[in-house]
Amino acid sequence: MAILRTSEIRTMTIEERADELENLNNELVRERALTSAGGAPENPGRIGEIRRTIARIKTIQHELNEI
């Protein structure tokens, strides 16, 4: 899953943003589970990227009063 830019997030519909947020949260849980199980992540910076993208989506949702 690609990391989204702010401009890409703003052009999404409300439903697309909600779906993307759910997908990213699920991916974050999987990455954290892999790490906590002792596995080495394929991309160590991926967890931070996912967290930042989630924050971007939530910020834009708040700005647009979608929450």
Curated annotation (Swiss-Prot):
Pfam families: Ribosomal_L29. Coiled coil: none annotated. InterPro entries: Ribosomal_uL29, Ribosomal_uL29_CS, Ribosomal_uL29_sf. The keyword Ribosomal protein applies. The keyword Lyase does not apply. GO terms for molecular function: structural constituent of ribosome. GO terms for biological process: translation. Gene3D superfamilies: 1.10.287.310. PROSITE patterns: RIBOSOMAL_L29. GO terms for cellular component: ribonucleoprotein complex; ribosome. Keywords: Ribonucleoprotein, Ribosomal protein. HAMAP family: Ribosomal_uL29. NCBIfam families: L29. Belongs to the universal ribosomal protein uL29 family. This is Large ribosomal subunit protein uL29. It comes from Methanosarcina acetivorans (strain ATCC 35395 / DSM 2834 / JCM 12185 / C2A). The lineage of its organism: Archaea, Methanobacteriati, Methanobacteriota, Stenosarchaea group, Methanomicrobia. The gene is rpl29.
